[in-house]
């Protein structure tokens, strides 16, 4: 499947298919030099898939740390200095091969190297079906996740579904959180459909039907980011579950998707408090437990600590913490939430796990 962005200009293709990696070679010839920034774990499993590409004299491989460990100032400087030592021009490509963190990091390198060079995303996880599309790139600060970054469109996204075959179950769980988030944004019928399809751990682990829902998720995100690239309006909806989730992820060092799922449950509780919504919290807890999410992290949450991270969230403004909330399916809002309500919701969340 080939999707295409529909901005007024500077559009890019998104290839979603088995064997999509073959498209990389069609781009290599266009650049003076290319640097493949590859996650160390992906390199262990799939190094041979890039042998043909690396046979080009102008293509270099840079192995970077896996996951969020790569999104540091130190790794950023080291990578830039290595690339600059090759006397690059602006007709250079940075090719990100890995999960969401790899794409974030490599994209920020591309955005800032010589004030911007070509950037190709080659996501290798389910989670990265979300982050590879839309142009958000960045690294982390001691104050929180993704606080240093840019909006920078890729030249192409090449999503080879063959990479998913070797994903450990923890990464499947983490990635499914973003697939599920897109279903929630689409509405009640889509949410019910995906819950009925991936109804237990065994089916989710098999990845049966995942191709379809990944493509749907990308289409959902494209509709939103093309309408609001710089996150002034509806693009904020894509942060569903992320305000609380990012804080939990950063403080408890758990997988991104696991934290987002906790954040999704939390926002349902906040919506119930603020709007008298009628979200069935136990339903979502039961569903996520059946899939195998380790929700016991919730019992260890200290609100005051999490709240400090929430205050650093880049979506906030002078009025304080902003959250995306599903009032009812089809009615999504971005709302300022006071500290008392946030604490009350956290206390309620923990009562489900006593």
UniProtKB/Swiss-Prot annotation:
GO terms for biological process: amino acid biosynthetic process; aromatic amino acid family biosynthetic process; chorismate biosynthetic process. GO terms for molecular function: 3-dehydroquinate synthase activity; metal ion binding; nucleotide binding. SUPFAM superfamilies: Dehydroquinate synthase-like (SSF56796). It is an enzyme of class 4 (lyase). Belongs to the sugar phosphate cyclases superfamily. Dehydroquinate synthase family. Its main location: cytoplasm. Its EC number is 4.2.3.4. NAD(+) binds at residues 100-104, 124-125, 136, 145, 163-166. This is 3-dehydroquinate synthase. The keyword rRNA processing does not apply. The keyword Nucleotide-binding applies. Pathway: Metabolic intermediate biosynthesis; chorismate biosynthesis; chorismate from D-erythrose 4-phosphate and phosphoenolpyruvate: step 2/7. Its cofactor is Co(2+); Zn(2+); NAD(+). Catalyzes the conversion of 3-deoxy-D-arabino-heptulosonate 7-phosphate (DAHP) to dehydroquinate (DHQ). The lineage of its organism: Bacteria, Bacillati, Bacillota, Bacilli, Bacillales. It comes from Staphylococcus aureus (strain JH9). It is found in: Cytoplasm. Keywords: Amino-acid biosynthesis, Aromatic amino acid biosynthesis, Cobalt, Cytoplasm, Lyase, Metal-binding, NAD, Nucleotide-binding, Zinc. PANTHER family: 3-DEHYDROQUINATE SYNTHASE, 3-DEHYDROQUINATE SYNTHASE, CHLOROPLASTIC. GO terms for cellular component: cytoplasm. Pfam families: DHQ_synthase, DHQS_C. Binds 1 divalent metal cation per subunit. Can use either Co(2+) or Zn(2+). It catalyses: 7-phospho-2-dehydro-3-deoxy-D-arabino-heptonate = 3-dehydroquinate + phosphate. Zn(2+) binds at residues 178, 242, 256.
